[in-house]
């Protein structure tokens, strides 16, 4: 089993990559999963979990259920089970479950521990590590949330065998995001290797990238913003399509292409670099059609992005391959010209 230590000032924890070990707990544990994952993987977890008392809360599967109602269900289960400050929650699922359980545990009794057991590629390489938690609102994605680090993260590649191809590819989008912004060697590996032959190494490399970024910038003051490449556009697209048309990684792939259009127009990417990223997305079937129906409305809604300050939009844009820049004060006309390409 491989381990990655994430040494933060207030709370350090480990990410374990390998077969799920026996988890022995001296306290009560509330497991939260979704309706699909629970049927596939809950028995596997229960075989390996030894706790004072265990209860399971199952939420409907899908991004549209990452809301106040589901959060309330989790908290009600915690109260009914009489969890205390020494108890913990366990997130068994993808990014939706990881985000919600992290948030629920951060506000229950002003904060209790939780363990992440991510079952999708996207959650393993991104959502389960770093402490970002939250729920969606009609106004946008993850607009209500907190920073709350897990007690531990357990990644078992066996979970990925049950993923549909579409779900798997959505996770690859997040790997590409990190590679383009932080590691050109990972870009080269994705370009030249068959991912099936090096999946564990790529996951380990991706988690290492995120771990190093989080250690440097836990609360996203500067370098961690690079992990939001594609998200300014992508998360708005998710909201505009009611979280039904695209998976998160698919929307982020569209968002990365929009960001690349903007970077190209600003001279931050050469045409060769632009085409290189485009071809990498094509290799993993991450090219999707999307049409903006109302350009002005879409532009105005960009200001709900959490990175915006003083009515100034900020975009994470690739600066070549393997680096990024936080770009602001971009002329409105330049942004609108990019949006027109998608109209």
UniProtKB/Swiss-Prot annotation:
Stated family: Belongs to the sugar phosphate cyclases superfamily. Dehydroquinate synthase family.
Cited Pfam families: DHQ_synthase, DHQS_C
This protein's record includes keyword Hydrolase: no
EC number annotated for this UniProt entry: 4.2.3.4
Cofactor(s) listed in the protein's UniProt record: NAD(+); Co(2+); Zn(2+)
Protein name according to UniProt: 3-dehydroquinate synthase
Functional description taken from the UniProt entry: Catalyzes the conversion of 3-deoxy-D-arabino-heptulosonate 7-phosphate (DAHP) to dehydroquinate (DHQ).
Cofactor binding description: Binds 1 divalent metal cation per subunit. Can use either Co(2+) or Zn(2+).
Domain of life: Bacteria
UniProt subcellular location: Cytoplasm
InterPro entries hit by this protein: Dehydroquinate_synthase, DHQ_synth_AroB, DHQ_synth_fam, DHQS/DOIS_N, DHQS_C
Organism in which the protein naturally occurs: Helicobacter pylori (strain J99 / ATCC 700824)
Alphabetical list of Gene3D superfamilies matching this protein: 3.40.50.1970, Dehydroquinate synthase-like - alpha domain
Predominant subcellular localization, coarse grouping: cytoplasm
Pathway: Metabolic intermediate biosynthesis; chorismate biosynthesis; chorismate from D-erythrose 4-phosphate and phosphoenolpyruvate: step 2/7
GO biological process terms held by the UniProt record: amino acid biosynthetic process; aromatic amino acid family biosynthetic process; chorismate biosynthetic process
Protein residues bound to NAD(+): 61-66, 95-99, 119-120, 132, 141, 159-162
Residues given in the record as Zn(2+) binding sites: 174, 231, 248
Molecular function as annotated in GO: 3-dehydroquinate synthase activity; metal ion binding; nucleotide binding
Catalyzed reaction equations: 7-phospho-2-dehydro-3-deoxy-D-arabino-heptonate = 3-dehydroquinate + phosphate
């Amino acid at each position: 089993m491989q381990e990655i230590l994430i040494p933060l000032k207030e709370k350090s924890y480990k990410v374990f990559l390998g077969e799920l070990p026996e988890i022995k707990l001296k306290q009560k544990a509330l497991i939260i999963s979704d309706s699909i994952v629970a049927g596939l993987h809950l028995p596997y977890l229960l075989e390996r979990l030894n706790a004072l008392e265990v209860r399971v809360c199952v939420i409907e599967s899908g991004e549209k259920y990452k809301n106040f109602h589901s959060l309330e269900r989790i908290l009600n289960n915690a109260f009914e089970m009489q969890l205390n400050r020494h108890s913990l929650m366990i997130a068994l699922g993808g990014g939706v479950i990881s985000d919600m359980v992290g948030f629920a545990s951060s506000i229950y009794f002003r904060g209790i521990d939780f363990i992440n057991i991510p079952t999708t590629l996207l959650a393993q390489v991104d959502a389960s590590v770093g402490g970002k938690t939250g729920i969606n609102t009609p106004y946008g994605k993850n607009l209500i949330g907190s920073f709350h680090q897990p007690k531990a993260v357990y990644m078992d590649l066996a979970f990925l065998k049950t993923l549909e191809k579409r779900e798997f590819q959505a996770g690859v989008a997040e790997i590409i995001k990190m590679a383009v912004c932080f590691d050109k060697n990972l870009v080269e590996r994705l370009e030249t290797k068959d991912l099936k032959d090096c999946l564990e190494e790529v996951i380990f490399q991706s988690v290492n990238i995120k771990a190093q970024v989080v250690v440097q910038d836990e609360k996203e003051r500067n370098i961690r913003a690079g992990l939001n490449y594609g998200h300014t556009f992508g998360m708005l697209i998710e909201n505009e399509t009611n979280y039904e048309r695209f998976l998160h990684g698919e929307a982020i792939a569209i968002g990365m292409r929009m960001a690349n259009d903007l970077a190209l127009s600003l001279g931050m990417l050469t045409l060769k670099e632009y085409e290189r990223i485009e071809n990498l997305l094509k290799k993993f079937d991450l090219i999707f059609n999307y049409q903006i129906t109302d350009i002005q409305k879409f532009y105005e809604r960009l200001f709900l992005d959490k990175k915006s300050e003083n009515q100034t939009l900020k975009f994470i844009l690739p600066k070549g391959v393997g680096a990024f820049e936080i770009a602001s004060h971009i002329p409105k006309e330049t942004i609108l010209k990019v949006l027109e390409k998608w109209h």
